[in-house]
């Protein structure tokens, strides 16, 4: 490999100014993401605020309904991935390799591992809102459409998808909103001795 052939290198072998700028910008962005990780409620409040600003913008401009519909479907897709287990139980159940010994008890605690973790869900949802907001600044994305039909399509899609997801949750007995293994309290200490 000759000098200057690697990505971002200038003719003299040092990283170019543009590469260093975007590299530093990426580091700052990642640093902000890392700092925001423990503040779940604050992150979601900011995202809901952005969503509210976006909805007001669409309402005032009276357009960009296709962009809003696409954003709604994208958020629905993210939500379904958030509710789904990482390993589909129907795939684990269908393996017919012949008779096998039981390896688990039915009541054994298994933590719910999501297909899409909460932080990635929040990050993707927020980026989706920002991209949709940017699209509202360009007239090319303002496709004329009768918006009540889009609302009806979205409600139907939401109901059908959630019905299927809830049936899947009931069939394979998993709840995506558990907070760990159930803990039982023992009997209170009734045999206390009193000092006289």
Swiss-Prot record:
Keywords: Acetylation, Golgi apparatus, Membrane, Phosphoprotein, Transmembrane, Transmembrane helix
Identification of the protein by name: Protein RER1
MF-aspect GO terms: acetylcholine receptor binding
Organism encoding this protein: Rattus norvegicus
Gene Ontology biological process: neuromuscular junction development; positive regulation of protein localization to plasma membrane; protein retention in ER lumen; retrograde vesicle-mediated transport, Golgi to endoplasmic reticulum; skeletal muscle acetylcholine-gated channel clustering
Gene Ontology cellular component list: cell surface; endoplasmic reticulum; endoplasmic reticulum-Golgi intermediate compartment; Golgi membrane; plasma membrane
Membrane topology: Multi-pass membrane protein
Cell compartment(s), UniProt: Golgi apparatus membrane
Protein family according to the UniProt entry: Belongs to the RER1 family.
Keyword DNA damage listed: no
Phosphoserine PTM positions: 2, 6, 10, 95
Gene behind this protein: Rer1
Principal location class: Golgi
Pfam family name, one: Rer1
Function of the protein: Involved in the retrieval of endoplasmic reticulum membrane proteins from the early Golgi compartment.
Residues modified as N-acetylserine: 2
């Amino acid at each position: 490999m000759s000098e200057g052939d690697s990505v971002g290198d200038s003719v003299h072998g040092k990283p170019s100014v543009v590469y260093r700028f975007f590299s530093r910008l990426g580091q700052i962005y990642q640093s902000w993401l890392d700092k925001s990780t423990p503040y779940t409620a604050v992150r979601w409040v900011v995202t809901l605020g952005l969503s509210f600003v976006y909805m007001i913008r669409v309402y005032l401009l009276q357009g960009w309904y296709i962009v809003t519909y696409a954003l709604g479907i994208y958020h629905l897709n993210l939500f379904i991935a958030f509710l789904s287990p990482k390993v589909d139980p129907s795939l684990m159940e269908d393996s017919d390799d012949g008779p096998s010994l039981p390896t688990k008890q039915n009541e054994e605690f298994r933590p719910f591992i999501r297909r899409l973790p909460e932080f990635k869900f929040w990050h993707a949802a927020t980026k989706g809102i920002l991209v949709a907001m940017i699209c509202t600044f360009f007239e090319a994305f303002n496709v004329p459409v009768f918006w009540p039909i889009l609302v009806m399509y979205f409600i139907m899609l939401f109901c059908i998808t959630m019905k299927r997801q809830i049936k899947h949750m009931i069939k394979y007995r998993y709840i995506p909103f558990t907070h760990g293994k159930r803990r039982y309290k023992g009997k209170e200490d009734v045999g206390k001795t009193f000092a006289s």
